[in-house]
Amino acid sequence: MFDLNRYQNNIAVITDSKDVFTYSDLHNMQAELFQHIGGRKLIAVLCENKIGALLGYICFINNQIVPMMLDKNINIELLNNLLNEYKPDYLWIPEENDYFTEYKVKCVLCGYKLIEYNNLNDITIFDQLALLLTTSGSTGSPKFVRISYENIISNTSAIISYLNISESEKAITVLPMSYTYGLSVINTHLYIGACIMLTDKKICDKEFWSFFNEFKGTSFSGVPYTYDLLRKMNFKALKVPSLRTMTQAGGKMSNDTSAYFYNYAINTNKTFYIMYGQTEATARISYLPFEYMSQKQGSIGIPVEGGSIELVDENNDKIREASIVGEIIYKGKNVSLGYALNRSDLEKGDENQGILYTGDLAYYDLDNFIFICGRKDSCVK
């Protein structure tokens, strides 16, 4: 999936402690880690925006190992519940984590350790299953979204296309790697041979922007709350000469805040993209082209390349007229395989067959741009 040899001389990662890793470095380190695993397994990963977590993710995806992506600060009771339900073969966790001292440590690399957790599984994992991500609404629940290799490649390619991501990009991490939007930033930049600036620092911290400017970052991504914070900080006064692109997803941004960042982008020769997606679609469903932002304020835009959107009424009939509200049905190769609640569900194949009922209600305007107005049973227009 990630062609580390093709981009071997490119800088892949810069950490906020100023460590620099090329794609060749990543290739060599992930090969070392893989030697300790040796086959298709399930691995629970406690993620943070550090080189160890990223290295593990690259190794697992590139070697047909399935990672369960979890935040490193997950509640221990919830973690134990998930481990009991999914029975992962290994854990890939920060070296300082001391919850699993009774288990064998197979290797330590880049501040992370590989723990042999459970070698008794006889359940076959579906051969197209690549990744398990929690859903936005499943905090406290064992529900994961089952994502395939095709899902990742399809969505990654579409995002690279509409954001015009090239090898020269340097994206700084704002969002958690265990969150579909945060992970999509990593996927797109690794896939094209670009650079990821890894930091766990908050976007409102002075050190975050010092790091961004020192290494000439070109983009950042955020949810509406991120942009509300930046606006309160008087972002327009911040000097970020290397910044090219800002992206937003993860919920509806207020019109005032979107106008603030649109005007900033226009006046400073940058671009700003508002996007819509769900974990069940691997990340992205639609985007609003920058040139339409002033005319189509509040819209989620148009479908990503390779995908299509239909609106259907209560009878599941397709809506063909403007301004009529219906549920968004998305179709594309990035639609996930389905859900999992436990280890045995990892045997399941593609239950969605490329069709996702999003539960979001929306309408078209006369130009076929889409405007969300709520969730099912709560839409007022």
Residue spans for each PLM region:
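Conserved ATP-binding/catalytic segment of the ANL
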Residues: 320-323, 327-381
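Conserved pre-ATP/AMP-binding loop-to-beta segment of ANL
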Residues: 6-8, 114-134, 141, 164-170
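Conserved AMP-binding/adenylate-forming
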Residues: 32-73, 174
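Conserved AMP-binding/adenylation subdomain of ANL enzymes
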Residues: 153-170, 180-219, 304-306
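Gly/Ser/Thr-rich phosphate-binding loop
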Residues: 217-222, 231-295, 308
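Conserved AMP-binding/adenylate-forming core of the ANL superfamily
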Residues: 9-37, 50, 77-80, 147-150
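ATP-dependent adenylate-forming carboxylate-activation enzymes
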Residues: 47-48, 68-83, 194-215, 226, ...
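Conserved AMP-binding A3 loop
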Residues: 22-23, 130-157
